[in-house]
Amino acid sequence: SGLEVEVVPSTFKADDLIARFEAKEIGGIFLSNGPGDPLTLINEKEQVQKLIGANIPMFAICLGHQMLSIAHGYDTYKLKFGQHGGNHPVAYNGVVEITAQNHNYNVPDNIVEIADITHQNLFDNTIEGVKYKNKEIFSVQHHPEASPGPHESKYIFAQFAKIVK
């Protein structure tokens, strides 16, 4: 995709990234996956809220997807049964993608107040992806980066690259 990626720790300071965005040193932020209960990540929530307020384009997966929801004021909830494995069907634009998943938490249905649902889990109808209204921010719950696969969701990275170039 021709992008240069720089990894920053989870202890990042939003003000530093905002300054770099305003100086055109970075074109966007990717919030990655990770372990644990997203509601316990108070500092990270505050930092993501600052990034949202700065209108920086963002793409997130799994824990990052959950953090965007929480930072927008929509708390996640724990699933009765976590979703784990490499064969979870997800609907996107009338197409079924087979996805890799590994999570115990999900974003709430009322996120539709501020985001459009882009991906839906076909096992339990939980939300698998959203695009925030009037923002260049989108996210998915599953793992499009999964290797060795499945790879049906790789297009998501190209969508983000198009926004940040």
Task: Annotate each PLM feature.
Residues 1, 24, 54-55, 113-114, ...:
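Structured helix-beta-strand junction loops
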Residues 1-8:
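Short helix-loop-beta junction
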Residues 5, 58, 137:
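Hydrophobic anchor at the start of a short beta-strand
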Residues 8-17, 37:
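Short acidic loop-to-helix transition motifs that present clustered carboxylates
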Residues 20-98, 150-159:
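Cysteine-nucleophile active-site neighborhood
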Residues 62, 103, 143:
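Active-site glycine-centered loops adjacent to acidic/histidine catalytic or metal-binding residues
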Residues 95-135:
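Catalytic beta-strand/loop cores that center a nucleophilic Ser/Cys/Thr
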Residues 129-165:
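A glycine-centered loop/beta-turn motif at secondary-structure junctions
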